[in-house]
Amino acid sequence: MTDLSDIRREYAKGGLRRADLPQNPMDLFALWMTQARDAELSDPTAMCVATVDEQGQPFQRIVLLKRFDDTGFVFFTNLGSRKAQQIAANNKVSLHFPWHPLERQVSVLGEAQALSTTEVLKYFMTRPKDSQIAAWVSQQSSKLSARQVLEGKFFEMKAKFAKGDVPLPSFWGGYLVRPKSIEFWQGGEHRLHDRFIYTLDNTQWIIDRLAP
């Protein structure tokens, strides 16, 4: 077994205090997202989306956040993907934003709700054309005999859609994750990290400090 126990560092970029927290967690999330973007972090919108299968086995993957507001967090995916199939059976999911250079993490528990075709199309039309074509090509999570199969399909579809707009695939969609709880983690000195969790109680957010 490889021993990694000596890899550590102190966290000293700042603290998080109850008096500084807004009542709405999405306001704090918006601030932290802005600061992550201003710091020019690589992929600040990247989040880990966790789902479970029918046996309770968890699965995780990195997905890009595309929109957020007071209602929740939006991402898009192939509806035939493993994540979409698992959401169809159990829409309870978790999201995790790892902003390591800022010594911050945000963890979200919530329920995924399918977006309307109108909402999906609105976003789909903003994607670069090659990305739109790629959505037609990949049967996400299916097995491939070789990469050349995928590339061949891509160039075939690229020729097919050379003129005009690329239509929205019926098997491509998106989700709004409505949060039930949001935890904010700020690294602290001597491993005394600051953790605050917002928990939704009907229409009110309850704020609690958690031990690190």
From Swiss-Prot:
EC number(s) per UniProt?
1.4.3.5
One biological process term from GO is: pyridoxine biosynthetic process
One of its Pfam families is PNPOx_N
Cofactor: how and how many bound: Binds 1 FMN per subunit.
Chain positions recorded as substrate binding sites: 8-11, 66, 123, 127, 131, 191-193
Summarize where FMN binds, as residue positions. 61-66, 76-77, 82-83, 105, 140-141, 185, 195
| Biological or metabolic pathway of the protein | Cofactor metabolism; pyridoxal 5'-phosphate salvage; pyridoxal 5'-phosphate from pyridoxamine 5'-phosphate: step 1/1; Cofactor metabolism; pyridoxal 5'-phosphate salvage; pyridoxal 5'-phosphate from pyridoxine 5'-phosphate: step 1/1
Q: Does the keyword Oxidoreductase apply?
A: yes
Q: Which reaction does it catalyse?
A: pyridoxamine 5'-phosphate + O2 + H2O = pyridoxal 5'-phosphate + H2O2 + NH4(+); pyridoxine 5'-phosphate + O2 = pyridoxal 5'-phosphate + H2O2
Quaternary context? Homodimer.
Q: Which PANTHER family match?
A: PYRIDOXINE-5'-PHOSPHATE OXIDASE (PTHR10851:SF0), PYRIDOXINE-5-PHOSPHATE OXIDASE (PTHR10851)
Function of the protein: Catalyzes the oxidation of either pyridoxine 5'-phosphate (PNP) or pyridoxamine 5'-phosphate (PMP) into pyridoxal 5'-phosphate (PLP).
The UniProt family comment states: Belongs to the pyridoxamine 5'-phosphate oxidase family.
Name assigned to this protein: Pyridoxine/pyridoxamine 5'-phosphate oxidase
UniProt source species: Shewanella putrefaciens (strain CN-32 / ATCC BAA-453)
